[in-house]
UniProtKB/Swiss-Prot annotation:
GO MF terms, alphabetically ordered: serine-type endopeptidase activity
Main location: secreted
Quaternary structure and partners: Monomer.
GO biological process: proteolysis
Any one annotated GO CC term: extracellular region
Protein's name in the database: Chymotrypsin LT_CH 1
Subcellular location: Secreted, Extracellular space
Organism of derivation: Lumbricus terrestris
Family the entry assigns: Belongs to the peptidase S1 family.
Keywords: Hydrolase, Protease, Secreted, Serine protease
Catalytic reaction list: Preferential cleavage: Tyr-|-Xaa, Trp-|-Xaa, Phe-|-Xaa, Leu-|-Xaa
Amino acid sequence: VIGGSDTTIGQYPHQLSLR
């Protein structure tokens, strides 16, 4: 999953900091 911490990707909120 690409995004920041607590970033909502589409409808999948996550707490993974993968940039």
